[in-house]
UniProtKB/Swiss-Prot annotation:
Recorded GO CC terms: plasma membrane; proton-transporting ATP synthase complex
Ranges that cross the membrane: 18-38, 76-96, 117-137, 173-193, 208-230
Subunit-structure text: F-type ATPases have 2 components, CF(1) - the catalytic core - and CF(0) - the membrane proton channel. CF(1) has five subunits: alpha(3), beta(3), gamma(1), delta(1), epsilon(1). CF(0) has three main subunits: a(1), b(2) and c(9-12). The alpha and beta chains form an alternating ring which encloses part of the gamma chain. CF(1) is attached to CF(0) by a central stalk formed by the gamma and epsilon chains, while a peripheral stalk is formed by the delta and b chains.
InterPro entries listed in its UniProt record: ATP_syn_F0_a_bact/chloroplast (IPR045082), ATP_synth_F0_asu (IPR000568), ATP_synth_F0_asu_AS (IPR023011), F0_ATP_A_sf (IPR035908)
Top-rank taxon, per record: Bacteria
UniProt KW keywords: ATP synthesis, Cell membrane, CF(0), Hydrogen ion transport, Ion transport, Membrane, Transmembrane, Transmembrane helix, Transport
Lineage, highest ranks first: Bacteria, Bacillati, Bacillota, Bacilli, Bacillales
MF-aspect GO terms: proton-transporting ATP synthase activity, rotational mechanism
Protein name: ATP synthase subunit a
UniProt main location, coarse: membrane
Record localization: Cell membrane
Family designation: Belongs to the ATPase A chain family.
Biological role stated in the UniProt entry: Key component of the proton channel; it plays a direct role in the translocation of protons across the membrane.
Pfam families: ATP-synt_A
Originating organism: Shouchella clausii (strain KSM-K16) (Alkalihalobacillus clausii)
């Protein structure tokens, strides 16, 4: 299998992953464009893209209602929608093809969620956001007391729990998507080795691409669901 490297560049002494930045920007643009077009001409009887957008919003509403009261959780509908839709699009981006330069074997196209830096950054952002809303919704006093209930000596374990939540949330998404792309790259490399290997690799590649769609969809759901679970722990008094 040929060795491929992700495109990187240095700016002000810092090393940036250009591949992740490119694909992340494209994924965000896809989400924004589809949402804007779908909501541009709203109708009482939705059709086409508006129908799809409303279905995604209803699905996100179901995720929120499953974890917290709607009066509290209704404010997170946009967050849930953005997380679910973006992670889904990002997961799907590596399925059709991989764009590689011939000279340096630099990968310019992949699922951005196969980069642990991105997934862990998103996970940390979610965990930090839960604490911000925890203070805003329950108040500083109630939020502060929650760290020492039911017993004060559990405080260190709660700190560890917050760190593990961010770590597992990010690494779960990264691990599944990275494994998906590695196996797909192996099948493609096998298929291009020789004609007879291409015949044997074609069917498994098609099957794996279909299964990759399922994996990407499932991981997008899990990421959005866990984000709302963590949010409910902070904004609702248990």
């Amino acid at each position: 299998m040929p060795e491929h490297h992700q495109y990187q560049f240095e700016f002000m002494g810092l090393l940036f992953n250009g591949t992740t930045m490119i694909t992340t920007t494209i994924a965000m643009a896809i989400v924004v464009i589809i949402t804007v077009i779908g909501c541009r001409k709203l109708a009482m009887r939705p059709t086409g893209l508006q129908n799809f957008i409303e279905w995604v919003v209803d699905f996100c509403r179901g995720i929120i209602k499953a974890n917290m009261d709607w009066k509290v959780g209704g404010r997170f509908i946009v967050l849930a929608y953005a997380l679910l839709f973006y992670v889904f699009v990002a997961n799907m981006m590596g399925i059709p093809f991989e764009l590689v330069t011939k000279e340096g074997h630099n990968v310019f196209w992949k699922s951005p969620t196969s980069d642990p830096v991105l997934t862990l950054t998103m996970a940390v952002f979610i965990v930090v956001l839960t604490h911000i809303y925890g203070i805003m919704v329950t108040g500083p006093s109630t939020y502060g007391k929650s760290w020492f209930t039911p017993k004060w000596f559990l405080f260190p374990f709660k700190v560890i729990e917050e760190g593990s939540n961010a770590l597992t949330l990010g690494m779960r998404l990264f691990g599944n998507i990275y494994a998906k792309e590695i196996l797909m790259l192996l099948l493609v490399s096998l298929g291009t080795t020789a004609v007879y290997w291409g015949i044997f690799a074609f069917v498994p590649l098609i099957v794996w691409q279909a299964f990759s769609i399922f994996i990407g969809s499932l991981q997008a759901y899990i990421f959005a669901m866990l984000a709302m679970v963590y949010m409910s722990h902070k904004v609702e008094q248990h």
